[in-house]
Amino acid sequence: MSLSRVSVTAVRNLHPVTFSPSPRINLLYGANGSGKTSVLEAIHLLGLARSFRSARLLPVIQYEQLACTVFGQVELAQGGHSSLGISRDRQGEFQIRIDGQNARSAAQLAEILPLQLINPDSFRLLEGAPKIRRQFLDWGVFHVEPRFMSTWQRLQKALRQRNSWLRHGTLDAASQAAWDRELCQASAEIDEYRRAYIKALKPVFERTLGELLQLEGLTLSYYRGWDKDRELSEVLATALHRDQQMGHTQAGPQRADLRLRLGGHNAADILSRGQQKLVVCALRIAQGHLVSQARRGQCIYLVDDLPSELDEQHRRALCRLLEDLRCQVFITCVDHELLREGWQTETPVALFHVEQGRITQTHDHRE
């Protein structure tokens, strides 16, 4: 799948624009502060209903504008196309439209437009809190396991009920036992989906990383959020008094983590920033392969400031892997000459110059 048309209005410093990207490689170049990253942010907003630059969306809306909007036409893997639109106003109201109809949730956008982001903050996947790695893991499971979303919703509902009971004790024992059974059942299913996903991801990740970097002894493992040798029901019963003191459930899928270790140490403590970037790239490219293998289409990659922290050899290796995915890629850089060469002659490459919020196409992929 790919975006064949994108329209952006009132997103940060961008002037209103409609452009037609290449179905494969798109290079957006220009000086720092010109608006290149804002273009990626607009696409990210269209696919996930959130920004990767700010936890709050108010700063995304252009000064003195009432709302920001992004529209896109998606060419679907199975043929045909889908029209997506999202608008967010200063009062925090969202409107999501899919093929002219109001959509209920951002998950519907994500299913149609699977996005992968690689940017200068990507190292946080290794250095950041477990929540970031759970989001990475669950993004992958969501796109390959059709049962994941409904099970996840069951889990969240049961977890909210238990946490409320821990804080306020508002349920009778029989009702709480029923919610605990639901929590344990949904947790077991989520753990099963995650475990199967990691089993599929590991060999693809290792192969992909080998194309980018030689790191002997790097291991990827999955911690499910509670003792692997005990049932969750037993763990919850044992920890009940402490959970009541804390006011929340301390064991379960909401505590899961991915662990990358090198020589017995946390990999993030040993690897350079450039090496961390390549490890994260390998993880995200491996996810793209699994989406394709599941016949769910292809990911769209948003790569912000690709040349940073990478030498020419590693830049070329990363570009080759992205090209081999045969998916749509948007790459920002200051100097497009660093990335313009090296693509296969049959790969459509489009160039867009971004200057003071204006986007001008300087090379059409059809030429």
UniProtKB/Swiss-Prot annotation:
Keyword rRNA processing attached: no
Keyword DNA-binding appears in the UniProt entry: yes
Keywords: ATP-binding, Cytoplasm, DNA damage, DNA repair, DNA replication, DNA-binding, Nucleotide-binding, SOS response
GO biological process: DNA replication; DNA synthesis involved in DNA repair; double-strand break repair; SOS response
PROSITE patterns xrefs: RECF_1, RECF_2
One cellular-component annotation, GO: cytoplasm
Cell location: Cytoplasm
GO MF entry, a single one: single-stranded DNA binding
Gene3D superfamilies, A to Z: P-loop containing nucleotide triphosphate hydrolases, RecF/RecN/SMC, N-terminal domain
One protein family per Pfam: SMC_N
Residue positions binding ATP: G30, A31, N32, G33, S34, G35, K36, T37
Family: Belongs to the RecF family.
Biological role: The RecF protein is involved in DNA metabolism; it is required for DNA replication and normal SOS inducibility. RecF binds preferentially to single-stranded, linear DNA. It also seems to bind ATP.
Stated name of the protein: DNA replication and repair protein RecF
Gene (name only): recF
